[in-house]
Amino acid sequence: MIFTKIVPRVSETDGVGHINNVFVPIWFEAGRREIFRIFSPKLDFLNWKLALVKVTVEYVDQLYLAAEVEIRTGIEKVGNSSFTIKEEIHQTKRLCAKGEAIYVNYNFQENKSEAISNE
């Protein structure tokens, strides 16, 4: 499990003081950074190897500006060329959002998926 702390910004709030729903998927992506490094250690797009093929977000509770959030990220399932990431956002000990992302190990030069290495 990977734990990532994020401090909400004023610009991420809406008119009633909640964190706007569009930022939850962005925060989830921030939590995937170390998983990205497994496939592209330098995080450079010349050698990028992942294609996002599905993302789901479930909003469970409200998020606010006043307290930092914790993104919890883990790999749930690994297939031949794809893997599934489970994600949660917690704030003040409350589960506020959960999601899932599926990535394919992808060769962009050859335009095709590739098997995930055991390394």
Which residue stretches match the model-derived regions?
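Hot-dog-fold acyl-thioester-processing enzymes
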Residues: M1-K54, F108-E119
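Hydrophobic beta-strand-centered segment that forms part of the acyl-chain substrate-binding groove
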Residues: I35-F83, C96-K98, V104
